[in-house]
């Protein structure tokens, strides 16, 4: 469990750094626009849009910018049509990697993703080559100073599949269909949620050496820096040394 939540923290810290460069804003606006185009502009009835807006607010995006992205999505006339794509491959050490993209040019995107894999000792696979190693689930992270018994009772009653305390966090895992029910139940009870998102969660983590980890992180960084890439998932288990170096 710890490997999942700690990597989520690494991604969160990197996200904050990206936000300072303005790079993450482009990806968030794109996700908001596509979510609104696909499911409408009402956050209460569009879970994908609700999650995208929450990510944008957490990255300190102005509400006006978010609203404009929603309007563009609902209007549907501005810009090129974005297509959701998922690429699968292997990184250094045979680590399984999923890459979720939104793009208006599939050829450009696959070329850039393939180049990143090749440059850092990985290779792009075929559809289904590694996706079976991951499960689509909800993940909710809370500070461990919250009342653990209360958190566990509310989360399980609302449909969570697992609750665990790791280091300074409480990690709650939910089926996709129960994600918003659990999240709302916790918030309605006055409990503070630090992070929450839908994710592709590795069923089993693969321990890797520190040397392999350095190469893998370079690959993941390069993938995440691509404009068309929205999310990168792996089944790597990092050592404490590597995790601490990411702080």
Curated annotation (Swiss-Prot):
The keyword Cell membrane does not apply. It is found in: Cytoplasm. The keyword Chaperone does not apply. One of its GO terms (biological process) is regulation of DNA-templated transcription. GO terms for molecular function: DNA binding. InterPro entries: Integrase-like_N, TACO1_YebC-like_2nd/3rd_dom, TACO1_YebC_N, Transcrip_reg_TACO1-like, Transcrip_reg_TACO1-like_dom3, YebC-like. Pfam families: TACO1_YebC_N, Transcrip_reg. Gene3D superfamilies: 1.10.10.200, 3.30.70.980. GO terms for cellular component: cytosol. It comes from the Bacteria. Keywords: Cytoplasm, DNA-binding, Transcription, Transcription regulation. Belongs to the TACO1 family. HAMAP family: Transcrip_reg_TACO1. This is Probable transcriptional regulatory protein lpp1249. It comes from Legionella pneumophila (strain Paris).
């Amino acid at each position: 469990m710890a490997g999942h939540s700690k990597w989520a923290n690494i991604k969160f810290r990197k996200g904050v750094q990206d936000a300072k460069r303005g790079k993450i804003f482009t990806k968030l606006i794109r996700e908001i626009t596509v979510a609104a185009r696909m499911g409408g502009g009402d956050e209460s009835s569009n879970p994908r849009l609700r999650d995208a807006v929450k990510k944008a607010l957490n990255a300190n995006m102005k509400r006006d910018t978010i609203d404009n992205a929603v309007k563009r999505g609902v209007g549907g006339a501005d810009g090129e049509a974005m297509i959701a794509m998922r690429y699968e491959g292997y990184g250094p050490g045979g680590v399984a990697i999923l890459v979720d993209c939104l793009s208006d040019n599939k050829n450009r995107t696959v070329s850039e993703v393939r180049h990143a894999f090749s440059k850092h000792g990985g290779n792009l696979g075929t559809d289904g080559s590694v996706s079976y190693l991951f499960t689509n689930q909800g993940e909710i992270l809370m500070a461990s100073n919250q009342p653990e018994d209360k958190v566990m009772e509310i989360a399980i009653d609302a449909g969570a599949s697992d609750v665990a305390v790791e280091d300074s966090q409480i990690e709650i895992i939910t089926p996709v269909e129960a994600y918003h029910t659990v999240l709302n139940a916790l918030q309605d009870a006055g409990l503070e949620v630090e992070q929450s998102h839908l994710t592709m969660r590795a069923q089993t983590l693969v321990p890797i050496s520190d040397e392999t980890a350095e190469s893998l992180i370079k690959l993941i960084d390069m993938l995440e820096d691509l404009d068309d890439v929205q999310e990168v998932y792996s089944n790597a288990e990092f050592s404490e040394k590597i995790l601490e170096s990411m702080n």
